[in-house]
């Protein structure tokens, strides 16, 4: 069976709350690091989330 090219990543809050989302991305089409504005329930507002390696 072929191994998928999608890699699991962690989107971590830049607010310093420790909250994170997990998702996957295609490494071939998007080799750069992702950054999204998402809701942080700890900070109770939308903050930038940056991609970090999932351990």
From Swiss-Prot:
Protein's name in the database: Large ribosomal subunit protein bL33
GO biological process per UniProt: translation
UniProt family annotation: Belongs to the bacterial ribosomal protein bL33 family.
SUPFAM superfamilies xref list: Zn-binding ribosomal proteins
HAMAP family in UniProt: Ribosomal_bL33
GO molecular function: structural constituent of ribosome
InterPro entries from the UniProt entry: Ribosomal_bL33, Ribosomal_bL33_CS, Ribosomal_bL33_sf, Ribosomal_zn-bd
Keyword terms, alphabetized: Ribonucleoprotein, Ribosomal protein
